[in-house]
Amino acid sequence: LVANATVLHARAGYDPVPPPSTRRHYRWPITGLTIATIIAGTFVTGSGPHTGSYDGDNIDRLPFDVPDIARVHGGIVIALVLVVITTIWHLNRTGAPRAEQWRGRLVLASLIMQAGIGYTQYFTGVPVLLVGFHILGATVTWIAVLWFHLDLSPEPDELGDKRGMLADEPSILVL
């Protein structure tokens, strides 16, 4: 639902000029690494103390060692941050519109905020309040990444996508 709402909001105010193709190839690595980060983060949360349903003395958890899966999660985040920094550098170097550069910086800022919360919760015994803030931050980061992805995406018309133009056809958005 968050992705659908973000796409709908972004498409409603689209600039009719698509970004140059030299910037488009960054959108999928960033989006893919973000998805991998969220999945790995879900595994970390599902393996930790604030997971599953509580039934007396039994708490259902995923069978992963928290330090190991947290390292996997952190490694994916580091790769994502490096790709975002590279993208921002490329956007600055090629004179991309300020809005695209700003959204790239927004993604980077949200990732840095998330990393700070994640490390703090890991080294302070995973307090439940920080887990909640980290999940909220993951949602904000996902929205920022989708917004940035859409900025770097071609228009549906440029792809030859005419679906949704007629009233009897379903409207399908192209990410």
Regions of interest found by a model, annotated:
Residues 1-175:
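Polytopic transmembrane helical bundles with strong interfacial aromatic enrichment
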